[in-house]
């Protein structure tokens, strides 16, 4: 059931075995540590740099990083991911009568509201028909709400993909999202 899947964990793990980058310390010299951001469906707390930790009167979490040598410190994940499930990507796809397998999203920096969770991102991927990958599709927009999407996850794959530094995800089967485009 979707409610069982929602009880999975969202982790921030600077030492994740297959991570593209591992960090013992953040750029402020604070030790990095493994954190369950969401555990059993319950939000455990924010990631913090020294500045945000001071503002909220909490301990820093080792998440103060510079995006460039000239940049300022911001709060960033080390390796943020939804903990993998037990189904293969092919097993998940085989359960979809008609849908879309999204392989890429662009514009998260501009198309995601971190407060409300609303998102609107350019996407590309493949049509799924009768449980099989069909034709490729590009330049469509995927819209929804992150928190609602998390509640509507029906299956989690065992195939974490590390495509970006700092963020990874296994294949997710989501009940529905809004799609627009040709």
Predicted regions span which residues?
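N-terminal small-residue-enriched
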Residues: 3-182
């Amino acid at each position: 059931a979707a409610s069982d899947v929602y009880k999975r964990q969202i982790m921030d793990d600077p030492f994740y075995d297959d991570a593209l980058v591992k960090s013992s310390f953040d750029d402020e010299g604070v030790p990095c540590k493994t954190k369950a951001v969401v555990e059993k469906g319950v939000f455990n707390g924010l990631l913090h740099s020294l500045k945000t930790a001071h503002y909220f009167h909490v301990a820093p979490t080792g998440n103060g990083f510079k995006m460039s040598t000239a940049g300022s410190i911001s709060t960033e994940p080390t390796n943020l991911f939804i903990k993998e499930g037990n189904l293969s990507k092919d097993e998940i796809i085989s359960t979809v009568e008609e849908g879309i397998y999204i392989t890429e999203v662009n514009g998260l920096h501009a198309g995601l509201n971190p407060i409300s969770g609303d998102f609107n991102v350019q996407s590309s991927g493949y049509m799924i028909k009768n449980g099989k990958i069909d034709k490729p599709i590009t330049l469509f927009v995927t819209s929804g709400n992150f928190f609602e999407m998390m509640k509507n996850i029906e299956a989690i794959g065992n195939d974490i993909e590390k495509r970006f530094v700092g963020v990874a995800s296994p294949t997710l089967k989501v009940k529905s999202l809004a799609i627009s485009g040709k």
